[in-house]
Amino acid sequence: RTGDDGKVEEGTAPIPFREPFVYTTSIAKPGFVRLFAEVVGAGPNVKFDGGAGAAFDRIVQMHGEPDDFDAFWKRELDALAQVPFDPQLEEVASPRPEVKLSRFRLGCAKGKPSTGFISVPRAPGKYPVRLYFFGYNESWSPRATAFPTAQQAPTNEIVLRVNAHGLENGRDAAYYAAARKAAGSNGYGHGFDPAENAKPETCYYLGMILRDVRAAQWAKTLPEWDGRKMLVYGGSQGGAQSLWTMALEPAITDAEVFIPWMCDWRGKAFGGRSGTDWGSEYAPGLDYFDLVNFAKRIRPDAYVNIFHAGLGDYICPPAGVASLYHALRCPKRIRWVQNCEHSWSSPAKGKQETVFTSPH
């Protein structure tokens, strides 16, 4: 047993065969308790990894944002606005004849273009736009970079599959392996170097966010866009990209995200919460990328659906995700799943789920 109160309990106990195993604990402050249990000798996936929260409505960001948060992002967006789109489109073979598929490349700040695939229905008409973003490791994998399937190029919406790193999509594995190595710093993976993260100007995520925003800005200029609905979609790092972009581009109306990453970095560093057990250690520059700070700035008439949050996910810890949810000032929904880690969920049927919604 661990938790946002810093308490740790461990031990072994016999398993009753005719009734549930019951473990009783408590927490004296708003936050979550995590319970990890496994059946001795039964294999790695015969386990429980989940938890419970107390005073859910009072689980909020523990420390304030930088005083110059808005000034910093205004400065960066103003610099981005000085760079022309200069869109370069290369039509490629489409997985379905009813859809036109192209690689896109857009002018952007911070030395790298905004890139990805765009699929547009060929039938005359106006369509909503969907921007897809991908997880940390996933963003280097074929799931993010390979040519879309027919299912990923629908006939009822415009889809941009945005490359997180400003790379050309549809290349071979060696290309991405070399690019991933180059994106690292001081032996850390992209975005993990504490020296880079000491200042927001040198954080890897700054360029990533500007590339994402640039893709959304360009999408607004497409003659096929219906001018009404623009949706962002992604999980983990892709969930962060979705909400970063939504906060900085007010044309975005909807978000569908799961296990969103980068929430309430200071909660672990200064508040004693159970923080992420993977990736970046806290550094001051990360305050400018904390997703809770962006959530406050999403337009109040938008809609955010966090359709999956794991109660055993301590890459994206529940207290941080709850803080994100409570910072949103728009209609919202969150679905908590019991016995669910970041990339593993119990195969058992009938897992406990808890859903919260709010009209504002």
Annotate the PLM regions.
Residues 190-236:
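Gly/Ser-rich "nucleophile elbow"/oxyanion-hole loop immediately N-terminal to the catalytic nucleophile
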Residues 8-14, 67-70, 78-125:
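N-terminal cap/lid segment of alpha/beta-hydrolase-fold proteins
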Residues 322-360:
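C-terminal catalytic histidine-bearing segment of alpha/beta-hydrolase fold enzymes
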Residues 266-329, 336:
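The feature captures the conserved acid-bearing segment of alpha/beta-hydrolase catalytic domains
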Residues 30-42:
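Short, aromatic- and glycine-rich surface loops/edge beta-strands on solvent-exposed regions
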Residues 15-18, 42-67:
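Short beta-strand elements
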Residues 137-210, 264-276:
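Cap/lid segment of the alpha/beta-hydrolase catalytic domain
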Residues 171, 235, 239-284, 336, ...:
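Hydrolase active-site cap/lid region
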